[in-house]
């Protein structure tokens, strides 16, 4: 199959990594897969089999010759419909119209979702959200993930414990400011710990002034992230329900990292019973959950055992199996039947 993924940006992010993983797995199966993006190829991802075309979508040769075109963000849907050939899909990793940061363009986002595409969802809850907003049915394909890359040796006993918090602090979706506020509260109570932060963006003035962060890592390459997880003792994932899928939380579970996660559909889908949950957006509850893990070694050990098998249930090859079936079925439906 000639498959094209339309990528809005090659900047480091979990959503971009998911797209590149899907493309690479399908290319390894013999399909002609091209990622088309107006930006240079990402240096942080080891791309081996899939092709990369740096081009405006309107001028893309691969898109003009595609059998399957996959939009991966709301801004790429219209180009996929306008310039793609064959069957057009829309890979949904979160419903952008519900994000506070996209409120000024929410009407444009809804218009993009109304365009004639076959929708793909990472989770059952996201499928429900799309249906509730009038965007029709979506196929749940699951999350592309390689748990083996994050396998970690037993953590040494060390004090103080280090807490890893991932994501951009600006904006509501990731809940990072909720998490940092909770950690500041715990520091004020005299709890001893270190805070490790990782984000694709520079340290913000707000976070610097808060003064709770001990180490800040910017734009860590995908192949270096496992080592950062191994340096931590706890993972804090405070994202809000609008977040379609929290990839760092899954990576933390695969790394045997005890996790305190917000009680959202995405986290329940990825973590099951392998994490300690707290109400999303509740700074006091976040502080209590983190304090529990800081003080309870046995609970940390229990969650560390549960994480890897749970994360191992998400496999890129399973996602590729589903995509191949959907792509072939859609392409057959697009082609006129023989007389």
Please describe what each predicted stretch is:
Residues 276-283, 292-297:
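Conserved acidic donor-binding segment of nucleotide-sugar-dependent glycosyltransferases
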Residues 58-64, 102-122, 126-127:
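Membrane-proximal helix-turn-helix segments that form the acceptor-binding/catalytic region
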Residues 4, 120, 155-174, 180-187:
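Conserved donor-binding/catalytic core segment of Leloir-type glycosyltransferases
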Residues 292, 299-313, 325:
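A short, well-ordered alpha-helix in the C-terminal region of glycosyltransferases
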Residues 230-244, 257:
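Acidic donor-binding loop of glycosyltransferase active sites
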Residues 61-64, 221-232, 254, 268:
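Short acidic alpha-helix that forms the nucleotide-activated donor recognition element
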Residues 97-103, 131-132, 140-160:
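Acidic anion/phosphate-binding donor-loop and adjacent secondary structure
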Residues 203-226:
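Nucleotide-activated donor-binding/catalytic signature segment of Leloir-type glycosyltransferases, i.e.
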């Amino acid at each position: 199959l000639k498959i094209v993924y339309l990528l809005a940006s090659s900047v480091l992010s979990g959503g971009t990594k998911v797209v590149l993983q899907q493309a690479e797995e399908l290319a390894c199966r013999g399909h002609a897969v091209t990622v088309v993006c107006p930006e240079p190829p990402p240096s942080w991802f080891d791309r081996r089999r899939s092709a990369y075309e740096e081009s405006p979508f309107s001028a893309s040769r691969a898109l003009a010759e595609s059998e399957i075109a996959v939009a991966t963000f709301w801004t790429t849907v219209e180009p996929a419909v306008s310039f793609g050939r064959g069957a057009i899909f829309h890979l949904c990793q979160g419903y952008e119209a519900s994000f506070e940061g996209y409120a000024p363009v929410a009407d444009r986002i809804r218009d993009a979702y109304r365009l004639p595409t076959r929708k793909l969802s990472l989770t059952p809850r996201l499928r429900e959200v799309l249906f509730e907003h009038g965007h029709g049915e979506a196929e749940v394909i699951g999350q592309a993930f390689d748990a083996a890359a994050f396998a970690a040796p037993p953590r040494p006993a060390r004090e103080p414990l280090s807490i890893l918090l991932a994501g951009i602090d600006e904006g509501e979706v990731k809940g990072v400011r909720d998490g940092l506020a909770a950690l500041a509260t715990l520091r004020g109570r005299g709890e001893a710990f270190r805070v490790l932060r990782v984000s694709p963006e520079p340290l913000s003035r707000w976070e610097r002034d808060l003064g709770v962060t001990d180490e800040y890592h910017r734009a860590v390459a995908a192949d270096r992230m496992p080592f950062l997880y191994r340096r931590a003792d706890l993972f804090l994932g405070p994202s809000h329900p609008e977040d379609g899928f929290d990839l760092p939380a899954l990576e933390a579970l695969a790394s045997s990292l005890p996790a305190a996660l917000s009680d959202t559909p995405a986290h329940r889908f990825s973590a099951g019973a392998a994490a300690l949950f707290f109400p999303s957006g509740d700074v006091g509850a976040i502080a209590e959950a983190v304090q529990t893990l800081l003080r309870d070694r046995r609970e940390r050990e229990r969650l560390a055992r549960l994480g890897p098998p749970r994360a191992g249930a998400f496999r890129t090859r399973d996602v590729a199996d589903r995509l191949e079936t959907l792509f072939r079925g859609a392409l057959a439906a697009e082609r006129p039947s023989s007389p």
